[in-house]
From Swiss-Prot:
Keywords: Cell inner membrane, Cell membrane, Lipid A biosynthesis, Lipid biosynthesis, Lipid metabolism, Lipopolysaccharide biosynthesis, Membrane, Transferase, Transmembrane, Transmembrane helix
Enzyme nomenclature, EC number: 2.7.-.-
Record-level GO cellular component terms: plasma membrane
TM region(s), chain numbering: 18-38, 47-67, 79-99, 118-138, 150-170, 182-202
CDD domains: LptA
Record-linked InterPro entries: Alkaline_phosphatase_core_sf, EptA-like_N, PEA_transferase, Sulfatase_N
Membrane topology: Multi-pass membrane protein
The protein, known as: Phosphoethanolamine transferase EptA
Purpose of the protein: Probably catalyzes the addition of a phosphoethanolamine moiety to the dephosphorylated 1-position of the disaccharide backbone of lipid A. Lipid A that is 1-phosphorylated is not a substrate for this enzyme.
Amino acid sequence: MASLFHLRFLKPLSCLQAGLLYSLIFGVLYHFPLFVYVYKESNQVSFIAMMVVVLFCVNGALFLALGLISASLMRWSAIVFSLLNSVAFYFISAYKVFLNKSMMGNVLNTNTHEVLGFLSVKLFVFIVVFGVLPGYVIYKIPLKNSSKKAPFLAILALVFIFIASALANTKNWLWFDKHAKFIGGLILPFAYSVNAFRVSALKFFAPTIKPLPLFSPNHSHSFVVLVIGESARKHNYALYGYQKPTTPRLSKRLADNELTLFNATSCATYTTASLECILDSSFKNNAYENLPTYLTKAGIKVFWYSANDGEKNVKVTSYLKNYELIQKCPNCEAIAPYDESLLYNLPDLLKEHSNENVLLILHLAGSHGPNYDNKVPLNFRVFKPYCSSADLSSCSKESLINAYDNTIFYNDYLLDKIISMLENAKQPALMIYLSDHGESLGEEAFYLHGIPKSIAPKEQYEIPFIVYANEPFKEKHSIIQTQTPINQNVIFHSVLGVFLDFKNPSVVYRPSLDLLKHKKE
């Protein structure tokens, strides 16, 4: 193998030649999804030609600029980018994602367990074919010492070509401006490198979180359970008309008029942004503290139990991960890996805090892909056959949907169990369940979530929103019945309204965003 490379590249390449060759390799190997997107959206071959010029110029300028510093730096950067590009290329191809700022925020917030869930043979093949092999070729191409003048002039020439090409296509600027963030999310390595830097910079320079004006809570001794689901889409809930019996327990409760359903959409198609929206006050459209922190400061007991990630800047009475909760539970090994572990302490909380105002937030693992079957105990995998592969495109449509529907079936059991505990509670108790966002299961060749909402299919943002109140709660509050679509931003004010003393209400509270009517005694 080595001898073949030495024969082919008998003469060492100059920095200029190598930089342009690397640019050509990158343009050919990793940008088929970009060309498909551009042609699909424009139906113009000339637009693809424009993108070829752009790719050659930007990648060429990148490598030549690195070459001005050091030929070795240029080579090793190309090798590293080859490996990173292969992973990015896999996810773009397999899940139809755009590596924009929001998606890179998701990537940087991904934990080890979620990363392991994406491992597959297909990913390994992509890394070998599009990462290791090109990297090896680049490594074996000999480089020679050469003048810095030629690469510098070439960079100027590439910049000139880029500008000239842009000026020649002024009539198409509006189209490119409209699609810029999607095109940018497909140009490698800039998509992930630039956007990862943007996300990191935003975190570093994040504005200081401001305190909200304090309020005096009432003495209703209410217990609110806010259940935040993961990747649950409304379409697959029998409650909302889905043909398969995915929610038998909740459907019975709905028939008995125990539940209220809302037509809701998520603020975003990824967890971090949706969580911020759910917990945000929208007060003066600025960076103010979120709901759990605000209520905790007011003296309300706030507990956050999580089987998920994405939470940040949360100050509560107690924050526990599911594995921490389960350590206190004897003989709970069977439920330890699953969302049911979050419910272990709920009966104790109801008893111990019966004379206090309490908010319990349960952040579920829910229907998080791609390994849907791992979110469900064996006895809840009722829809068969079900897909158990991380490579969702390799699964049949039936098995993929069955795997997902099993997560909804299990979620039905969890919510019913919560309701059973609350309906027997002495204090006023309310449960609100909503998902952070939806999920794609192969519709329009999309999988998972995270597509920018402006172009995302409805499956990624139409979510279930379910409310239950026990009898003591109904004596003091009523749930508004409406068919008007709502957003996740109603949560802050609906929960705050439960705890407000309306004789001295908070200036933050917005009644128009409250799903409840309160008896203002």
